[in-house]
Amino acid sequence: MSVVTATPPAGISNRNQPDSCNVLLSVRNVQKVYGAREAVTRALDDVSFDICEGEFVGVMGPSGSGKSTLLNCISTIDTVTSGNIILNGLDITQLRSRQLSKFRRDDLGFIFQDANLLDTLTGFENIALALTIKGEKANDVRAKVDRTADLLGVADVLQKYPRQMSGGQRQRVAAARAIVADPKLVLADEPTGALDSRNAAVLLETLEVLNEKLNATIMMVTHDAVAASYADRILFIKDGKLFNELRRGDADRTDFYQRILEIQAFLSGKQGASSAVGFVASHVSALRK
């Protein structure tokens, strides 16, 4: 496993990942290469890690580091050049086209930066779509949508169309759509990127609810340290490699946020204690807004 790690502070261990856990996602020696001969770009370079069932994992890194490529490979939007991605015992790199469609429908939930709701469907219909595609009975669909909407606080917008909702409401409806069919893994791609700080906080609290109350396994790509501080563990990617791993453990979210910023400062070239501390200090107020 090609990882350059920093030793975690003493006494820190991940909240949701004990020494022995049920590994849901296993990424093994994944490489993704674009181009050929002299014009080769190695977007992912021997990346390996595990995610446990019920874990909330963030993925961070500079622009062009490979984090979006990693998400695309796990979601089967893109294919790996070599290596294996195993979800719940199934090696998805070996699936054929028809099998991939079933895999995406049954095992994955998606939350995108722009919600991606269908404008001609109500909130209820957007959430129900995942269940309808699976052929579930109408009574079961209504019960599951209502239960999920109540949990995520969007019951009052079920009869509204996306254009009648706020940005935060649209993203929470998207989160409900992602989880209503009980997927094995929820993939979130910059889910707060199009939201103001207030609506971003509401969405992140929604993801926390999914993780803590439904034991949803979440993998979230983000550039935002505030968003990442809601996760149990952060994987940092640099130049296509898994550069570092940071666990929250028993730290509160503010402390975890500061540690994330320190690594971000290092990755961005702001090395040294004084610059890292200054970088942290300039951002701490974001958690208090």
Segments (PLM) and residue ranges:
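Conserved ABC ATPase signature
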Residues: Y161-M165, Q169-Q171
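Short coil-to-helix segment of the ABC ATPase nucleotide-binding domain corresponding to the Q-loop/switch region
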Residues: L121-L129
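Conserved beta-strand-loop-alpha-helix hinge in the C-terminal portion
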Residues: K241-F266
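Conserved ABC ATPase "signature" region
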Residues: L90-D91, A128, T132, N139-D156
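Catalytic Walker B motif of ABC-type/P-loop ATPase nucleotide-binding domains
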Residues: V186-D189
